[in-house]
Amino acid sequence: MIILDINQNYKYFMFNKVCLKFKIKNFNILVIYLYDIKEKNIYKTIKNKIKNFSYFFKKMPCIINIKYLSEEDQYFWKYFHKKLSNLGLCIIGVSGCNNKIWEKIITRNGLLIFKEQINKKIFYEKKNKITKINNNYIIDKPIRSGQTIYAKKKNLIIMNTVNSGAEVIADGDIHIYGIMRGRASAGASKDTKSQIFCTKLYAEFISIAGKNWINENVLNSYLGKPVRFYIKNDILTIQKFSL
């Protein structure tokens, strides 16, 4: 027998043992913005992107934003969605639906519709809950593909390379004194003052307090250079620095 306790935990009545919990969590989700699905080369472009960054796209959930598509594009959606699915993208839903016709088309495909509106009050309250950073977590070995390192309540300092397919996370700042090819997420506790520093930038993914960049967002002039990432005016910003 299972009962619901006042803490929203389900327990076995006889053994008083927790068997499941309900929690609200925030996750990073890739959003693909579409502007014209009639374009002949769009499939080739997406396919090449997946091939070049296979570690990034592998099992990564994504949302398709159709805000900029025309009414004419509605007739091509079913075919386009099928082609995208065949490329291996894990599409969980669609955002940017601006009329009921689009909503009907999307729901027929069995996809969820995500609203783009943000509850500013809730966001503000969460933003104030900053985790206190107590110390530094230092690693002098390379971070291999498939590894995930999390520096809880700490700054993370890596004195080596972060390989493609690896992920480093910290509640505070991240310093990488080597080649950065993987994924880095600083300010995991929503601290917008957190920063990321690396001496050679080739990252697949960069995030600070939920503000994200992927590799294609980075101009070529910054690749391979010493840079820092920080948030300015609520925007994730990149800046070169001298060693």
UniProtKB/Swiss-Prot annotation:
One Pfam family linked to the record: MinC_C
- Report the transmembrane regions from the record: none
Q: Write the record's keywords in alphabetical order, separated by commas.
A: Cell cycle, Cell division, Septation
Q: Which Gene3D superfamilies match?
A: 2.160.20.70, 3.30.70.260
Record GO biological process: cell morphogenesis; division septum assembly; regulation of cell division; regulation of cell septum assembly
Keyword rRNA-binding attached:
no
Range of residues in the leader sequence:
none
* InterPro entries (alphabetical): CAP/MinC_C (IPR016098), MinC (IPR013033), MinC_C_sf (IPR036145), MinC_N (IPR007874), Septum_form_inhib_MinC_C (IPR005526)
Top-level taxon of origin = Bacteria
- Keyword Cell division found: yes
- Which PANTHER family does the entry link to? SEPTUM SITE-DETERMINING PROTEIN MINC
Whom does it interact with, and what assembly results? Interacts with MinD and FtsZ.
Q: Which NCBIfam families match?
A: minC (TIGR01222)
Function text: Cell division inhibitor that blocks the formation of polar Z ring septums. Rapidly oscillates between the poles of the cell to destabilize FtsZ filaments that have formed before they mature into polar Z rings. Prevents FtsZ polymerization.
Q: Report the family membership.
A: Belongs to the MinC family.
Protein name in UniProt: Probable septum site-determining protein MinC
This chain's source organism reads Wigglesworthia glossinidia brevipalpis
Q: Which gene encodes it?
A: minC
